[in-house]
Amino acid sequence: MAVNFPSIDPAQLHPVAGVTLGWAEANIRKPNRKDVLVVSVEEGATVSGVFTENRFCAAPVTVCREHLAKVRAGGAGIRALVVNTGNANAGTGEPGLAHARETCAELARLAGIAPGQVLPFSTGVILEPLPIERLKAGLPAALANRAAANWHDAAQAIMTTDTLPKAASRQVTIDGHTITLTGISKGAGMIKPNMATMLGFLAFDAKVAQPVLDALVKDVADRSFNCITIDGDTSTNDSFILIASGKASLPQIASTDSPAYAALREAVTAVAQALAQLIVRDGEGATKFITVTVEGGKSAAECRQIAYAIGHSPLVKTAFYASDPNLGRILAAIGYAGVADLDVGKIDLYLDDVLVAKAGGRNPAYLEEDGQRVMKQSEIAVRVLLGRGDAQATIWTCDLSHDYVSINADYRS
């Protein structure tokens, strides 16, 4: 059951000029469900992305990297994205690569563009052949119903074990020009740092030079999708894509040092964080949304390292599910996080406003009923003070319930 999942009104998902979306029911894995998405981008847009660090990456990830490398080398820009659910096209070897390229070629033929201008994405079951003929057969319908307002349908078309579609949108003013941003994401399990069974697509109408967009997508991913964890597994297919359509009146952003870049980064990060947090709120079997903040570190990297040790711990996550204030498990996770010179005698631990541990030991004033009161909440904040610097980092995670096991045990049935 999703945790405090906000209601998404399709009418409040702003169309982004220069971007249209269409979907189809292609029976990739199950009948009568949206399972193919096509996103078309008008000429002149810039597109960039970051992808899984799993060495067993899926075939479409390999093809996306190839096509974006050609764009960065001066080739024609990306004009379309195609996404299928129900099959990951991962662990499929050379036939899988051939199918990913065949998908691009077929969409390119139908749309009148080059195969290298298409980025393919797949999500679903690993180690099964992609039903390429069914996927290709769905492309004409997806192209036919493209519209700028189809963001909510698009969010539905990329769902797998998600229980709800995930989308976010906002408009901001930069240097007196209105910029529209809208995005969708999917994911409910196998989520950890460097992304995982996670797809995110975020479009906006600012005009951004390719090298600047390449920097922006990495920066935004590091502040959003790389700050979430559900079960600590890294998947084969995760991808986060930014589309800058260039249709707004704001002059091109050509430098990462410009005030306009800083303003755009703030806006894109806000939408990306909303999309990332929706994934955690819809985590498989999740009943609680947990924010873990580590402060007072020597570097943001070590703060995030400790935060993830807490967020990945099955013992910590099951304690939250049970509302059991066995909070020594958090201290243990801090201790094995791998920060070699950590002085545990300086560490304070808070659960919301409750000081649980002070200077590395139990706070004499701490009462277990206070800890349990917080742990019964559906929204919980864990705060760790390291006392060794000024850096900090925040991640978002969820608890681990019986339903998580059931969902994953029954995934293919």
From Swiss-Prot:
A Gene Ontology BP annotation from the UniProt entry: ornithine biosynthetic process
Stored Pfam families: ArgJ
UniProt binding sites for substrate: T160, K186, T197, E284, N408, S413
Keyword terms: Acyltransferase, Amino-acid biosynthesis, Arginine biosynthesis, Autocatalytic cleavage, Cytoplasm, Multifunctional enzyme, Transferase
Record text on subunit structure and interactions: Heterotetramer of two alpha and two beta chains.
Keyword field contains Chaperone: no
E.C. code: 2.3.1.35, 2.3.1.1
Active-site residues, as the UniProt record annotates them: T197
Keyword Acyltransferase belongs to the record: yes
Subcellular location: Cytoplasm
Catalytic activity: N(2)-acetyl-L-ornithine + L-glutamate = N-acetyl-L-glutamate + L-ornithine; L-glutamate + acetyl-CoA = N-acetyl-L-glutamate + CoA + H(+)
Site (Involved in the stabilization of negative charge on the oxyanion by the formation of the oxyanion hole): T123, G124
A GO molecular-function annotation: L-glutamate N-acetyltransferase activity
Gene Ontology cellular component annotations, sorted alphabetically: cytoplasm
Pathway in which this enzyme or protein is active: Amino-acid biosynthesis; L-arginine biosynthesis; L-ornithine and N-acetyl-L-glutamate from L-glutamate and N(2)-acetyl-L-ornithine (cyclic): step 1/1; Amino-acid biosynthesis; L-arginine biosynthesis; N(2)-acetyl-L-ornithine from L-glutamate: step 1/4
Family annotation (InterPro entries): Arg_biosynth_ArgJ (IPR002813), ArgJ-like_dom_sf (IPR016117), ArgJ_beta_C (IPR042195)
Protein function: Catalyzes two activities which are involved in the cyclic version of arginine biosynthesis: the synthesis of N-acetylglutamate from glutamate and acetyl-CoA as the acetyl donor, and of ornithine by transacetylation between N(2)-acetylornithine and glutamate.
Gene field: argJ
Entry protein name: Arginine biosynthesis bifunctional protein ArgJ
